């Protein structure tokens, strides 16, 4: 499948996914170089899968910072593959930081903002929204899927100052 292709193409050794996605792709370990499959969530996991929450438990203050060359590879974003297999676009740490900073500046984001979104974080736009929330200190209300009624309730409940979405989300 697509995850297997991307994991093999980029040489991934670890895949981190939501519980549901991790369950649906657990065969990727047998078909690629992936050694670990890590899942978010509280649900029980099958043997051979690691819990993200368990990995962090008790270690919240033990992360060491590392020096990173801003021009080194940060992310490989994959195209949709409309003309064949998906193609990886290599982005440096500088690329990501500047994109996040410029988007925050253009959208006038600040730590006083609350953004509601259902954009998937692995998608480029979703990643920029998530990273922008981290950079500016704004509150991020992230929904696992787009449902117009749920989103509208969330905007009201959280007194959102921003909604981030793709054009089809604004047509409801």
Features from the language model and the residues they span:
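Structural core segment of the AMP-binding/adenylate-forming
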Residues: 1-54
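Short beta-strand->loop structural element characteristic of the AMP-binding/adenylate-forming
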Residues: 1-16, 88-90, 117, 139-145
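Residue-level signal for inorganic ion chemistry
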Residues: 6, 15, 37, 137, ...
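Conserved S/T- and glycine-rich ATP-binding loop of Class I adenylate-forming
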Residues: 15, 73, 79-82, 115, ...
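Adenylate-forming
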Residues: 15-26, 119, 144-149, 160-172
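Conserved pre-ATP/AMP-binding loop-to-beta segment of ANL
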Residues: 39, 57-78, 85, 108-114
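Conserved AMP-binding A3 loop
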Residues: 74-98
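Conserved AMP-binding/adenylation subdomain of ANL enzymes
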Residues: 97-114, 122-162
């Amino acid at each position: 499948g697509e995850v297997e292709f991307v994991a093999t193409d980029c040489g991934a050794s670890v895949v981190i996914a939501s519980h549901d996605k991790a369950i649906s792709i657990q065969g990727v370990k047998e078909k690629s170089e992936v050694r670990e499959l890590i899942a978010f969530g509280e649900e029980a996991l099958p043997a051979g899968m690691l819990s993200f929450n368990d990995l962090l438990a008790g270690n919240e203050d033990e992360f060491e910072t590392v020096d990173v060359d801003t021009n080194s590879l940060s992310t490989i974003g994959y195209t949709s593959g409309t003309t064949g297999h998906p193609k990886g676009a290599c982005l440096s740490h500088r690329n990501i930081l500047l994109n996040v900073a410029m988007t925050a500046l253009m959208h006038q984001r600040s730590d006083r903002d609350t953004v509601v979104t259902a954009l998937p974080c692995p998608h480029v736009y979703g990643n920029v929204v998530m990273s922008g929330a981290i950079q500016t200190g704004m509150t991020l209300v992230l929904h696992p899927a787009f449902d117009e009624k749920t989103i509208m309730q969330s905007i009201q409940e959280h007194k959102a100052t921003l909604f981030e979405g793709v054009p089809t989300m604004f047509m409801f």
